[in-house]
Amino acid sequence: MRILITGGSGFLGQALTQALLGRGDEVLILSRDTSSNARNKQASHWLTSLEEIDAPIDAVFNLTGANLFSRPWTKARKRQLRDSRIALTESLVNWLAKQTQAPRVLLSGSAIGFYGDQGERELTEQSAQGHDWAAKLVADWEQAAANLGVRTVYLRTGLVLGDGGLLQPLRPLFKCGMGGSLGDGQFWYSWIHLQDWVSAALYLLDHDSANGPFNLTAPTPVRYEQFAKDMGKTLHRPVWLTPPAWLLKLLLREQASLLLGSTKALPQRLQQIGFQWQYSQLSEALEAILKPTENS
């Protein structure tokens, strides 16, 4: 297949690109990042504009979006976060709609932040949208992709664990014994190994009846307290420092909701269509990611 990936230079996009190329697909990457590090990946084509595309596209992965944690959420930054997702998705959909041949499927980025903080409630794809700013951001991002008139899948992604992503800033903290539980540690984290995220994305690409939202998480969410214990055990480090919730809220303000919010998302629809996880237990996922690094 001929596949376009927007945001292909990011953590998820790079892993997805390698998997697609590995199975023989032609991959076109549209990216704002034109640095040598990003362009060094073995994509079939690198693009800085949709107008450079000169032949029909079979499928699109829309993964564009600025990092939610890289800067404080000022009013200007919030506009950037929305524009990098919603405005760019609207531009993509408008461009695709004008082509003589539309893609067969659009798989658009999303997040379990759609549900917001819902405490102990188990959340499936049928659960209601949350009410905080991040939940509205995700809901509007999905809506921006909704009007192309082709099969559309929303990749409601949980916390992706791999060599990079969430673990990159956490690993040095845990190695220094500073990776203790956040707040009371009782909130839920819905996670997924990077390899399973890629496999699920490909499964949804190839599964012609898959449509609408899918939670891309492991079937076994954990409380953050357990996440911290498993991290410490894998790295052979004590877990003792526990920053209080009030301090995190003071330092991070609205962004603290992404760390302290409880989102117990379950991948009900992936299970219903027969997807199989390689890493369904957090301890196994962390061992696979962290042990090779520790031994190298």
Predicted regions and their residues:
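Conserved Rossmann-fold NAD(P)-dependent oxidoreductase catalytic core, especially the SDR/UDP-sugar
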Residues: E90-H131
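NAD(P)H-binding glycine-rich loop region in Rossmannoid oxidoreductase-like domains
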Residues: Q42-S91
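Alpha-helical substrate-binding/gating segment
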Residues: R171-G179, F187-P221
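C-terminal amphipathic/interface module of NAD(P)-dependent oxidoreductases
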Residues: S257-S296
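Glycine-rich "substrate-gating" loop/helix at the edge of Rossmann-like oxidoreductase active sites
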Residues: A128-D132, R156-G164, D184-L194
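N-terminal Rossmann NAD(P)H-binding glycine-rich loop of SDR-like oxidoreductase domains
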Residues: I3-G22
